[in-house]
Amino acid sequence: MSNNTRMDGLPAQPNLRVTIIAADGLYKRDVFRFPDPFAVATINGEQTKTTQVSKRTLNPYWNESFDFRVNEDSILAIQVFDQKKFKKKDQGFLGVINIRIGDVIDLVPDADDQMLTRDLKKSNDNLVVHGKLIINLSTNLSTPNRTQQTPSASRPSLLAPQTSTPNGTTDRPSSAMSSAVSTNGTPAASQPMPLAHRPASLASTTSTSQATAAATTSTTTATANGTPVQPRQVDVRQLSPFEDALGRLPPGWERREDHLGRTYYVDHNTRTTSWNRPTGTGQSDAEATQQAQRQQHQNRSLPEDRTGANSPTLQQQQAVAQAQATALVHTGATTAGTGELPPGWEMRWTPEGRPYFVDHNTRTTTWVDPRRQQYIRMYGGNNPNGIIQQQPVSQLGPLPSGWEMRLTNTARVYFVDHNTKTTTWDDPRLPSSLDQNVPQYKRDFRRKLIYFRSQPAMRILSGQCHIKVRRSHIFEDAFAEISRQSATDLKKRLMIKFDGEDGLDYGGLSREFFFLLSHEMFNPFYCLFEYSAHDNYTLQINPHSGINPEHLNYFKFIGRVVGLAIFHRRFLDAFFITAFYKMILGKPVTLADMEGVDADFHRSLQWMLDNDISGGIIEATFSTEDERFGVITVEDLKPNGRNIEVTNENKREYVELMVKWRIQKRVEEQFKAFKEGFNELIPQDLINVFDERELELLIGGIAEIDVDDWKKHTDYRGYTESDEVIQFFWQTVRSWDSEQKSRLLQFTTGTSRIPVNGFKDLQGSDGPRRFTIERAGDINNLPKAHTCFNRLDLPPYKTLEQLQQKLTMAVEETMGFGQE
């Protein structure tokens, strides 16, 4: 063998130690199962070693070392396979890296260790691969080669013959690089090896103590003759949760991973989380971000509430009306500056002192002074800018049949429709602010809102509900205050007081309260909610919230808070997956809803429905695996489901059961508690008048959208910004009001939420993803949205009118998102 070694130009003894540490973000090639990855390391296609198998993971951690004989021209190839599929045609290939040794390390005894992170590459089969591989190269072989062994781990059985040298290296006669590397490759030593460096994106969030213990690499070991030796300190070490590859985190910050392996940062000082690594100016940055979020939150509104940019608030209107009514009662005078009554009119007073007006021309009476002008705002149609117009009430004529005009106790006029038993602030004689040119959904949503808020169950009761909280402990204080009060008390006028702050709540304090509380309640820090796979700001219930033994009480409290915000016409700064809104409305979830939960899984299920799966293409049963805190259990989707195979005949039932389990069944207890609290304030029959997209707007409000910012951060495929159809598109968007823009944003991205820093921070299912308009489809087709990628497929319409018609119809009529 030594002669062959000299001919190959390789040393007689191993001179390089390769530590295969981990892989991150492997591709999930199987539809319903995670792979069992293992790695195969090869030098020039001759010396081959194999790691243990990591079970059911896309982020395997091996930390195994192997010694090789190399020179500067040697090529190190490390391939990753799925052990479940190793005997199949593609061998479960998950990626490969190729490294020329001389390019990365000097082959001298005192050379520094090299920690490498390389992207996995495709093979000749051109199969899709994802992820990175982390390895360490060292020329110091003075310490025994110790490979980590665990009882649950196993090595894959590779079928080709091999010859093992005494040091465990496998020599193969063929020098060709094979995608099917063949070895058993058991290393000579089997003592546990201290953990090497593990990158931030692979660190476990639940094993801090283990990581701390593993970081100690200077333990004393013994040689074969019993002489104690002190191994050299390894230059690379296990990163603690309080640092990452860029160094130490600021005081009070911790690095964690979510259920999808995405790294995020926890600020224990403020009990907040962030996707961005904190900097030295983190505190000022956090304050600036929160202030921007607060401003954005306070600018949200609903159609019924918007009567002009500078319109007074409801409290201001009531205060002015009350003052005017008081002046009329005490002085008997009319409104200042109104002049003489029109011919044929007379002002009289009721026994209580309230003025009313008699029109002798028509022999009718009214509470409204005919000299006053009624201001209305026209939406849509020929008045897109919402210009305020004036029209004398005296020229409107009598009310329609079945209608009655009344006054509130603050002298505000409203109208009763006895035909439908509803009330409205809008005078039915005035031109409707929702004329026939306005989309049907807008007319419906506003009328639904009027109906919803006019019902007896939604009226604020007499009295006051006092809630006192500390800003620094708003979650705990609000939980105690809201939980102790009855639903009846919570329906009284809300009076919020912040500890140590003097102020009267005329709406501003309660808006601030719901803003701050929503940031705390839905913070993943508390493990009650988690970010969806769709992006990093839409929320879903955390199926593992049971780690908190009081989690059901908290979910009932959160349900109360959401109901409280709707009841008192306040907004929460939180947005959920579409399926969550459908669950509140009692609607069944469908496969389309899975896209907002897990886009890859949605595509897998859709592929199953669209293709023939006979012949064992998919090895699945009516069961699924569920991992809770490291323990994997098998859950049946139906009785004895683990013994029922999925076929072409029953695959539709399987998909329905799988969707229901992924979205509903896993969080059934939590959602039941949420609904219990929610329905204490909001009756189910009333909330059911809305659909899921309207419910999102009802809870979160409608934001003012900066079209210039939207346009600035838009990409084009097949179009340029100067193309006529693109000009038509932005012209149409600018002509729409805030609600229509929010609907378009919902249609194209899946949510009406705008990132705090604007459209430049828009997220997709795979990270930051700018809004994109792509040229696709025939001009007779409607535009199509891909919500996971924030993409709009826009046909090249010839005229502005055609684009407006098609885009409006697509936004109005589409019931689900991402119809691909």
Curated annotation (Swiss-Prot):
This is E3 ubiquitin-protein ligase RSP5. Disulfide bonds: none annotated. Keywords: Cytoplasm, Repeat, Transferase, Ubl conjugation pathway. It catalyses: S-ubiquitinyl-[E2 ubiquitin-conjugating enzyme]-L-cysteine + [acceptor protein]-L-lysine = [E2 ubiquitin-conjugating enzyme]-L-cysteine + N(6)-ubiquitinyl-[acceptor protein]-L-lysine. It comes from Chaetomium thermophilum (strain DSM 1495 / CBS 144.50 / IMI 039719). Pathway: Protein modification; protein ubiquitination. PROSITE patterns: C2, HECT, WW_DOMAIN_1, WW_DOMAIN_2. The active site is at residue 788. Residues 140-189, 271-289 have a biased composition (Polar residues). InterPro entries: C2_dom, C2_domain_sf, E3_ub_ligase_SMURF1, E3_ubiq-protein_ligase, HECT_dom, Hect_E3_ubiquitin_ligase, WW_dom, WW_dom_sf. Residues 486-820 form the HECT domain. Residues 200-224, 313-326 have a biased composition (Low complexity). Its main location: cytoplasm. GO terms for molecular function: ubiquitin protein ligase activity. It is found in: Cytoplasm. Residues 247-280, 339-372, 397-430 form the WW domain. GO terms for cellular component: cytoplasm. Residues 140-255, 270-326 are annotated as: Disordered. It is an enzyme of class 2 (transferase). Belongs to the RSP5/NEDD4 family. Residues 1-118 form the C2 domain. The keyword Transferase applies. E3 ubiquitin-protein ligase which accepts ubiquitin from an E2 ubiquitin-conjugating enzyme in the form of a thioester and then directly transfers the ubiquitin to targeted substrates. Interacts with creD. One of its GO terms (biological process) is protein ubiquitination.
